[in-house]
UniProtKB/Swiss-Prot annotation:
GO molecular function terms attached to this record: rRNA binding; structural constituent of ribosome; tRNA binding
Oligomer status and interactors: Part of the 50S ribosomal subunit.
Gene3D superfamilies attached to this UniProt entry: 3.30.190.20, 3.40.50.790
Family that this chain belongs to: Belongs to the universal ribosomal protein uL1 family.
Protein name from the UniProt record: Large ribosomal subunit protein uL1
InterPro entries: Ribosom_uL1_bac-type, Ribosomal_uL1, Ribosomal_uL1-like, Ribosomal_uL1/biogenesis, Ribosomal_uL1_3-a/b-sand, Ribosomal_uL1_CS
Signal peptide: none
Pfam families: Ribosomal_L1
PANTHER family, sorted: 54S RIBOSOMAL PROTEIN L1, MITOCHONDRIAL (PTHR36427), LARGE RIBOSOMAL SUBUNIT PROTEIN UL1M (PTHR36427:SF3)
Organism domain of life: Bacteria
UniProt keywords, alphabetically: Repressor, Ribonucleoprotein, Ribosomal protein, RNA-binding, rRNA-binding, Translation regulation, tRNA-binding
Gene Ontology, cellular component aspect: cytosolic large ribosomal subunit
Entries under SUPFAM superfamilies matching the protein: Ribosomal protein L1
Length: 233
């Protein structure tokens, strides 16, 4: 049998596999178990009572995190005229139209979020093979195709969790960093869960929010006690 690393032994000693943790307990334990030299994110996985094989049960959207995401977000905006100026004033890092499309085609993708005004989609639509695989393709369902590009930029800069159910009906999102206080993680998590409840498909039957798990980038997953969350009541 292979020897456990010091970190693996610590996790095995500290984590109770069957326990339902409060957010505060989970954040404290993940912080205690964090031994890496970079700032880990705090991630959440939410198992939803949906059938992802059915198109009307795909849950997709975004949540503005009230306490931010804990990282700097670089935003690119496809817009022209007044929209371009509004995007710049709102803090966009890169703003352009055909010129920005050429940068993308050349592989210059030094940004985390792409926003587009509706009139720019005739150009952005041609970039699907580049932006799509990187999760950067603008989409109206998550608020990144919008006539109000300034608000979209401010939301992205403030910190947003974007999500879409995977093939198993699970949502994955970051809700902060390991340096956040527990109440900030709780606030972000409850904002996300509130939006997920609002996005419940009409055809979804039975229990909708089935399981919530918090983890850090390199840490274990800790199941959260749903009964202790205001957004699940």
């Amino acid at each position: 049998m292979a020897k456990l690393t010091k970190r693996a032994r610590l996790i095995a000693e500290k984590v109770e596999a069957t326990k339902l943790y409060s957010v505060e307990e989970a954040v404290a334990l993940l912080s205690e178990l964090s031994t890496v030299k970079f700032k880990e994110s705090i991630d959440v996985s939410v198992n939803l009572g949906v059938d992802p094989r059915k198109s009307d049960q795909v849950v997709r959207g975004s949540t503005v995190l009230p306490h931010g995401a804990g990282k700097d977000v670089r935003v690119a905006v496809f817009a022209q005229g007044a929209n371009a100026e509004a995007a710049k004033e709102a803090g966009a890092d890169v703003v352009g139209f055909e010129d920005l499309a050429e940068q993308v085609k050349a592989g210059n993708l030094d940004f985390d979020v792409v926003i587009a005004s509706p009139d720019a989609m005739r150009i952005v639509g041609q970039l699907g093979q580049v932006l799509g695989p990187r999760g950067l393709m603008p989409n109206p369902k998550v608020g990144t195709v919008t006539p109000d590009v300034a608000t979209a930029v401010r939301n992205a800069k403030a910190g947003q969790a974007r999500y879409r159910t995977d093939k198993n009906g699970i949502i994955h999102a970051a809700v902060g960093s390991i340096e956040f206080a527990a109440d900030a993680i709780r606030g972000n998590l409850e904002a996300l869960l509130t939006d997920l409840r609002r996005a419940k498909p009409a055809s979804s039957k039975g229990v909708y929010l089935r399981k919530v798990t918090l983890s850090s980038t390199m840490g274990p997953g800790l199941q959260i006690d749903l009964g202790a969350l205001n957004s699940t009541k």
